[in-house]
């Protein structure tokens, strides 16, 4: 009777729903592993699960007064961390057929993300051979019984959902020592818990996800700021989004690809969301690619209109672009301000109250925006992402990293770059964090000062940018940073060292590609390994295809919810080329994406990037990574700029060419360094050419197309 009354009370107050139940609880041996978000979690499971489980609870909690009061109604077993026999007792209970609930995190979350997973629960599952049923609780964290009251909009009676995920097994890992087996089992359970979180992510559009974040964190929560130093809340950002969307629909059509040539600023964020909510697909143009790059983008994406700002063009010394690029109609934001009518203002006011009614009908799998590859190995390609693929990458990041509304991001990487867009705009907005948008990562003195002034806690950048920030920063500028992540290029040892020595900060290295929205793998404090780029994100499948001549690693192929919809190529304007990759049998498989990167994945799942497939040279039948050549040169000249390329050689097929800004580099020095580090002499270039500066793309990466031409034509290097 008491159970029925309490169940009815909870269902009435919290509108509790439970989904996913079929035969998940019919297994003979069963362990239930829920996430832990509030003090209500145990009561919810006791009341709404269709079975009567035993709860594993720490002994210090079982001795409290309220647990003694609950003892006649709820079965629980006390766990004493100091007594190993408690785990064995739990294993026996599972083997006897008693379903057991274990909270693997061991404590209520204080971040909203998964906390540390204790391997005891995993060991019980592996030792007993029980089925593991993960459960996701959504909603209790908003109550006053959670521990997120300082970061979430707490409500008395929020809606609560209990999601029951399919049962899985956790076999005992193979390892020589018992401790290693426990650790590996714990990592496997952590992967199961992360997969459970990804499985219940709602399918939304970008605009719907922003509205969900506004509901979750509060409409007046500050969220975005730029160099005007006027911080906007979700409400004021929404007002700008609605205003831009209203104006955009006058000169663009639904489904049209709309070019945007804009800096890192709040108005750019408003333009991106404003375009998508009215069914337009923004194409974010690289303003450093020059007229030729813009023309390629216009052709590939079939752009008719480019939205920009006169002030931006003047400050960026880009006023020549509209004159040189006449293939599209240029629209200036400054000209649009005076076109706002009373009807527009009333429309905006109405939809501030009911913003979802401003959306045109869309699905999560519809195209959301277009990014462009760097063009480092050929013509830039348009990469079309759906709402679902972009938001999946945000959720993958949220699953492994504990970003909260207490954080503040410094976003200086350009938004036309996938790295800057996802981690510098979408991630902070969807996690309730505040973000400061700065228009250039090249201002090496200004960025550290702003990190200090705005109390930023999260900084993403390339190795080059982070190294330069460290050189110009005061030792106290980065005192508040707790996440510093490097991506887009290999993290240099010198950059790692200066950050550790000067600031006491460990840089976490990650790896991504535009086609994956872009993050593929990343080191985080909970799972990091030196000289790797971290583990593949949850929700993604990976496979390593062997490559003849390469012993360690192979070509990385990926499949998952964050993979692009397809390419738009200059050669086939407006035609979407869906991703596919060749498997080990030589067959093309749809849905897989071939990164073109040579990767090794160790037994713990950590990835090491060996280099680009296209950046391997075949010298006398041996495969040599051009990136390994560059790393060798960096050991003896860490301050210089170096890039390796190949040229045709009649004797060996190919020969190495080293371009460097250091005139002191000689083959003798390189041979000595190679012997000391165990690098074969075959990887030491004979052709060394000194240049004033390497040809670079707008993203800061070396222009390998130009370098290849320079390698074949010595006069170009002169």
Curated annotation (Swiss-Prot):
GO terms for biological process: fatty acid metabolic process; phospholipid biosynthetic process. GO terms for cellular component: plasma membrane. GO terms for molecular function: acyl-[acyl-carrier-protein]-phospholipid O-acyltransferase activity; ATP binding; long-chain fatty acid [acyl-carrier-protein] ligase activity; medium-chain fatty acid-CoA ligase activity. The chain crosses the membrane at residues 258-277, 409-433. The active site is at residue 36. It is a multi-pass membrane protein. Residues 15-138 are annotated as: Acyltransferase. CDD domains: LPLAT_AGPAT-like. InterPro entries: Aas (IPR023775), AMP-bd_C (IPR025110), AMP-bd_C_sf (IPR045851), AMP-binding_CS (IPR020845), AMP-dep_synth/lig_dom (IPR000873), ANL_N_sf (IPR042099), Plipid/glycerol_acylTrfase (IPR002123). Keywords: Acyltransferase, ATP-binding, Cell inner membrane, Cell membrane, Ligase, Membrane, Multifunctional enzyme, Nucleotide-binding, Transferase, Transmembrane, Transmembrane helix. SUPFAM superfamilies: Acetyl-CoA synthetase-like, Glycerol-3-phosphate (1)-acyltransferase. It is found in: Cell inner membrane. Residues 233-646 are annotated as: AMP-binding. Its main location: membrane. Its EC number is 2.3.1.40, 6.2.1.20. It catalyses: a 2-acyl-sn-glycero-3-phosphoethanolamine + a fatty acyl-[ACP] = a 1,2-diacyl-sn-glycero-3-phosphoethanolamine + holo-[ACP]; a long-chain fatty acid + holo-[ACP] + ATP = a long-chain fatty acyl-[ACP] + AMP + diphosphate. Plays a role in lysophospholipid acylation. Transfers fatty acids to the 1-position via an enzyme-bound acyl-ACP intermediate in the presence of ATP and magnesium. Its physiological function is to regenerate phosphatidylethanolamine from 2-acyl-glycero-3-phosphoethanolamine (2-acyl-GPE) formed by transacylation reactions or degradation by phospholipase A1. In the N-terminal section; belongs to the 2-acyl-GPE acetyltransferase family. This is Bifunctional protein Aas.
């Amino acid at each position: 009777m008491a159970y029925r009354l309490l169940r009815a009370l909870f269902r009435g107050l919290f509108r509790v729903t439970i989904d996913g139940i079929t035969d998940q609880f019919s297994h003979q041996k069963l362990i239930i592993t829920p996430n832990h978000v509030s003090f209500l979690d145990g009561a919810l499971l006791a009341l709404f699960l269709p079975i009567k489980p035993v709860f594993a609870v720490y002994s210090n909690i079982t001795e409290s007064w309220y647990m003694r009061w609950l003892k006649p109604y709820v079965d629980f077993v006390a766990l004493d961390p100091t007594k190993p026999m408690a785990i064995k007792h739990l294993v026996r209970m599972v083997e006897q057929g008693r379903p057991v609930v274990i909270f693997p995190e061991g404590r209520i979350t204080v971040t909203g993300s998964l906390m540390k997973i204790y391997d005891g629960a995993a060991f019980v599952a592996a030792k007993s051979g029980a089925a593991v049923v993960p459960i996701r609780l959504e909603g209790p964290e908003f109550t006053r019984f959670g521990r997120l009251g300082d970061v979430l909009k707490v409500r008395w009676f929020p809606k609560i959902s209990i999601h029951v995920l399919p049962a899985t097994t956790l076999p005992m890992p193979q390892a020589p020592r018992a401790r290693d087996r426990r650790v590996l089992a714990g990592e496997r359970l952590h992967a199961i818990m992360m997969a459970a979180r990804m499985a219940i992510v709602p399918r939304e559009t970008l605009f719907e996800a922003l509205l969900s974040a506004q509901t979750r964190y509060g409409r007046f929560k500050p969220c975005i700021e730029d160099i005007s130093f006027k911080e906007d809340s979700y409400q004021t950002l929404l007002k700008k989004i609605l205003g831009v969307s209203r104006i955009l629909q006058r000169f663009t059509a639904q489904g049209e690809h709309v070019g945007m040539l804009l800096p890192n600023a709040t108005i750019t964020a408003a333009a991106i969301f404003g375009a998508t909510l009215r069914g337009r697909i923004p194409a974010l143009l690289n303003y450093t690619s020059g007229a030729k790059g813009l023309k390629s983008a216009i052709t590939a994406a079939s752009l008719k209109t480019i939205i920009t700002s006169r002030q931006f063009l003047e400050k960026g010394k880009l006023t020549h672009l509209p004159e040189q690029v006449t293939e599209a109609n240029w629209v200036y934001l400054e000209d649009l301000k005076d076109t706002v009518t009373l009807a527009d203002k009333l429309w905006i006011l109405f939809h501030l109250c009911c913003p979802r009614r401003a959306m045109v009908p869309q699905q999560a799998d519809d195209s959301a925006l277009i990014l462009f590859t760097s063009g480092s190995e050929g013509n830039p390609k348009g990469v079309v992402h759906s709402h679902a693929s972009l938001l999946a990458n945000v959720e993958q990041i949220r699953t492994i990293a504990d970003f909260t509304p207490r954080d503040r991001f410094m976003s200086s990487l350009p938004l036309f770059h996938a790295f800057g867009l996802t981690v510098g705009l979408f991630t902070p907005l969807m996690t309730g964090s505040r973000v400061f948008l700065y228009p250039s990562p090249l201002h090496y003195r200004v960025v550290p000062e702003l990190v200090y002034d705005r109390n930023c806690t999260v900084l993403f950048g390339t190795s080059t940018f982070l190294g330069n920030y460290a050189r110009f920063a005061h030792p106290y500028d980065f005192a508040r940073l707790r996440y510093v992540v490097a991506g887009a290029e290999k993290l240099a040892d010198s950059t790692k060292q200066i950050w550790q020595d000067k600031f006491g900060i460990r840089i976490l290295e990650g790896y991504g590609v535009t086609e994956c929205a872009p993050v593929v793998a990343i080191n985080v404090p909970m799972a990091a390994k030196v000289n790797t780029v971290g583990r593949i994100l949850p929700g993604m499948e990976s496979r390593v295809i062997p490559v003849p001549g390469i012993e360690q690693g192979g070509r990385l192929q990926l499949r998952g919810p964050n993979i692009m919809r397809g390419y738009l190529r200059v050669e086939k304007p407006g035609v979407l080329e869906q991703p596919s990759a060749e498997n080990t049998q030589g067959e093309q498989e749809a849905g897989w994406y071939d990164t073109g990167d040579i990767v090794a994945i160790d037994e713990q799942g950590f990835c090491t990037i060996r280099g680009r497939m296209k950046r391997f040279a075949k010298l006398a039948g041996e495969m040599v990574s051009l990136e390994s050549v560059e790393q060798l040169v960096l050991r003896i000249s860490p301050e210089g700029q170096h890039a390796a390329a190949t040229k045709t050689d009649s004797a060996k097929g190919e020969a190495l060419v080293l371009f460097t800004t250091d005139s002191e580099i000689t083959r003798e020095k390189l041979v000595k360094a190679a012997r000391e580090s165990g690098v074969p002499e075959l990887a030491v270039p004979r052709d060394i050419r000194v240049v004033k500066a390497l040809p670079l793309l707008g993203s800061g990466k070396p222009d390998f197309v130009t370098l290849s031409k320079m390698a074949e034509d010595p006069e170009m290097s002169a």
